[in-house]
Amino acid sequence: MKASMFLALAGLVRLFVVGYASESEEKEFPRELLSKIFAVDDFKGEERGCKGFGDSCTPGKNECCPNYACSSKHKWCKVYLGK
């Protein structure tokens, strides 16, 4: 009788410890995932030499990427329609 009570108690303790350990791992998972997603140092993008759609520009300097033109009225890169 004492042995069965001891085994039952040991089983409950083990179940509690395993549950607590898995729960703490689950709490760390979102932090690890976010740190991997926002790790910008590993995947630094190349800087473009030209400016894309909506970027501010100076008219006449040809700073916009191909197929874009600097609008003299708004002073930002727009799609060049070839007028």
UniProtKB/Swiss-Prot annotation:
<keyword id="KW-0872">Ion channel impairing toxin</keyword>
<keyword id="KW-0528">Neurotoxin</keyword>
<dbReference type="GO" id="GO:0090729">
    <property type="term" value="F:toxin activity"/>
</dbReference>
<protein>
    <recommendedName>
        <fullName>Hainantoxin-III 10</fullName>
    </recommendedName>
</protein>
<comment type="function">
    <text>Selective antagonist of neuronal tetrodotoxin (TTX)-sensitive voltage-gated sodium channels (IC(50)=1270 nM on Nav1.1/SCN1A, 270 nM on Nav1.2/SCN2A, 491 nM on Nav1.3/SCN3A and 232 nM on Nav1.7/SCN9A). This toxin suppress Nav1.7 current amplitude without significantly altering the activation, inactivation, and repriming kinetics. Short extreme depolarizations partially activate the toxin-bound channel, indicating voltage-dependent inhibition of this toxin. This toxin increases the deactivation of the Nav1.7 current after extreme depolarizations.</text>
</comment>
<dbReference type="Pfam" id="PF07740">
    <property type="entry name" value="Toxin_12"/>
</dbReference>
<feature type="disulfide bond">
    <location>
        <begin position="50"/>
        <end position="65"/>
    </location>
</feature>
<feature type="disulfide bond">
    <location>
        <begin position="64"/>
        <end position="77"/>
    </location>
</feature>
<feature type="signal peptide">
    <location>
        <begin position="1"/>
        <end position="21"/>
    </location>
</feature>
<keyword id="KW-0638">Presynaptic neurotoxin</keyword>
<keyword id="KW-0800">Toxin</keyword>
<dbReference type="GO" id="GO:0017080">
    <property type="term" value="F:sodium channel regulator activity"/>
</dbReference>
<comment type="subunit">
    <text>Monomer.</text>
</comment>
<feature type="propeptide">
    <location>
        <begin position="22"/>
        <end position="48"/>
    </location>
</feature>
<comment type="similarity">
    <text>Belongs to the neurotoxin 10 (Hwtx-1) family. 15 (Hntx-3) subfamily.</text>
</comment>
<keyword id="KW-0964">Secreted</keyword>
<feature type="disulfide bond">
    <location>
        <begin position="57"/>
        <end position="70"/>
    </location>
</feature>
<keyword id="KW-0960">Knottin</keyword>
<keyword id="KW-0738">Voltage-gated sodium channel impairing toxin</keyword>
<keyword id="KW-1015">Disulfide bond</keyword>
<dbReference type="InterPro" id="IPR011696">
    <property type="entry name" value="Huwentoxin-1"/>
</dbReference>
<dbReference type="GO" id="GO:0005576">
    <property type="term" value="C:extracellular region"/>
</dbReference>
<dbReference type="GO" id="GO:0044231">
    <property type="term" value="C:host cell presynaptic membrane"/>
</dbReference>
<keyword id="KW-0027">Amidation</keyword>
<dbReference type="GO" id="GO:0008200">
    <property type="term" value="F:ion channel inhibitor activity"/>
</dbReference>
<keyword id="KW-0732">Signal</keyword>
<feature type="modified residue" description="Leucine amide">
    <location>
        <position position="81"/>
    </location>
</feature>
<dbReference type="InterPro" id="IPR013140">
    <property type="entry name" value="Huwentoxin_CS1"/>
</dbReference>
